[in-house]
């Protein structure tokens, strides 16, 4: 067993910068052996540190390379200086093809018996991933009492014009029990999601989202969305769902579009609490048409105490550059918190 303090001091004196995380490794013990002949190499190591244990087996034959690695309660949180992360137990097998010193293709699969995050231990996760030089594909499944899901995704043309596809089947998701959020108390979520994107930058990206069979259940409430479809292009956003539809046309910045929409609400409902003064912080210029027939999702999912028994219709145009807002809002009868409002148009 050797201390790394002296190594750290020498490297510092030589002005060789190490990643900050390396300094969290205080003690290290390494056992290993390597043999090779011709194009065949076998290397086995057992690494023990103050943060945990890693065992690996690397084999190279010609241009092919394989890796088997396992960890037992490796303290990744301490290694990465992340207070939310705890320990990780991992088993992984990987294989790849080399071209010179560059890996041209690689695939890996493994299981995660346990991972601690925010004082919750996730169990029974499995994954696989593959990369062929242009496309990455991967799958993840978790079978845990408080999160049961299957994810699958791919990303193609990563260096040129990325195209991604993603699907998720979430059979059970309990945010409070996972210590992620207390917003919905003991609620359980389930849904099916698929999404795709095309484009290199958010401002020029085209994307689609499909949600099916969304279910929310808690001790006091239940809510479901059978279908939700969203399509996004550089000059248009269109959303169709059980609870209504929204269509936006024109120039918009996804990061500031919320400010512009709140500006519409502030102009038409200046006394409504919870809406700050409009801040013109962008160059958004668009028209908005929306028809909302069900507001229960606003109350339950967004946590906003807004309710209307009648349809809400909005027709608006906004130009942040000229600081102009024209809006026609039909909001006959609604409540916000304990206050009742009428003729909000």
Model-derived features: positions:
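Interface amphipathic segments
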Residues: 1-345
């Amino acid at each position: 067993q050797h201390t790394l303090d002296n190594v750290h001091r020498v490297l510092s004196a030589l002005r060789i910068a190490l990643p900050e995380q390396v300094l969290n490794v205080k003690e290290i013990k390494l056992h290993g052996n390597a043999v090779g002949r011709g194009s065949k190499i076998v290397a086995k190591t057992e690494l023990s540190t103050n943060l945990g244990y890693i065992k690996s087996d690397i084999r190279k034959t010609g241009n092919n390379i394989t890796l088997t690695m396992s960890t037992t309660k490796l303290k990744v949180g301490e290694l990465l200086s992340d207070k939310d992360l705890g320990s990780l137990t991992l088993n992984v097998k990987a294989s790849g093809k080399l071209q010179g010193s560059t890996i041209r293709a690689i695939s890996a699969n493994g299981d995660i018996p346990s991972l601690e995050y925010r004082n919750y231990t996730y169990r029974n996760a499995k994954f696989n991933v593959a990369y062929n030089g242009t496309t990455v594909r991967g799958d993840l499944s978790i079978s845990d009492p408080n999160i049961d899901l299957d994810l699958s995704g791919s990303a193609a043309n990563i260096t040129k014009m990325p195209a991604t596809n993603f699907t998720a089947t979430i059979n059970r998701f309990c945010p409070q029990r996972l210590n992620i959020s207390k917003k919905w108390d003991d609620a359980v979520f389930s849904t099916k999601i698929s999404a795709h994107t095309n484009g290199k930058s958010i401002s020029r990206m085209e994307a689609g989202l499909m949600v099916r069979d969304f279910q929310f259940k808690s001790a006091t409430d239940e809510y479901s969305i059978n279908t939700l479809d969203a399509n996004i292009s550089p000059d248009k956003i269109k959303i169709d769902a059980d609870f209504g539809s929204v269509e936006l046309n024109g120039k918009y910045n996804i990061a500031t579009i919320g400010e512009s929409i709140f500006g519409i609400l502030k102009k038409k409902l200046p006394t409504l609490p919870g809406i700050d003064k409009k801040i013109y912080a962008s160059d958004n210029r668009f028209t908005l048409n929306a028809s909302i027939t069900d507001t229960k999702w606003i109350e339950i999912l967004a946590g906003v105490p807004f309710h209307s028994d009648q349809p809400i219709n909005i027709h608006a145009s906004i130009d942040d550059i000229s600081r102009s807002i024209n809006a026609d809002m039909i909001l006959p009868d609604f409540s916000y918190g304990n206050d009742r409002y009428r003729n909000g148009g």
